[in-house]
Amino acid sequence: VYLAGTDFGMRAFAGNFDPDELKAAVAYAHAHNVRVHCTINTMPRGDEIVRLPAHLERLNDAGVDAVIVADLGAFTLAGKYAPNCQRHISTQASISNYVTANAWYDLGASRVILARELSLEEIRTIRENTPAELEIEAFVHGAMCVSYSGRCLLSNYMTGRDASRGACAQ
């Protein structure tokens, strides 16, 4: 199950989980042998990053299986404050080649979620040039953004809604 807490998720207008709901959802999922992956895929600014350690500790304490991050700072904090959670790299990080996938793996990522814009052949090349232990995830559908994943400026320009803050107007 993929879900988000009330902070740091890219779905600003979704009914995300408060800490108590998240803990209950994780317990329910685990009772049914289902893993829970929590998104932390915004790019936190300085005034937001200070809240991230407490959020990560709550996720760790709730038993979340993996956190999905896009930002290197969030990735680093997840290793420190959510040591029981696997770290997955969001499509928002725009991983579009095997060198980048391997770099994230070397830093401790167990899964990379590739940029949505890749062809099947490009995905195959990444798989063939990364360790078998590194899980690869790829979207087969998705946003129609005029950009690479995680680098959208058009939404903000056209509507004043910042896609990199979870408010994409797509």
Give the ranges of each region predicted by the language model.
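Active-site pocket-lining/capping segments in soluble small-molecule metabolic enzymes
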Residues: V1-I95, V99, I113-E117, E121-Q170
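As written
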Residues: G108-A109
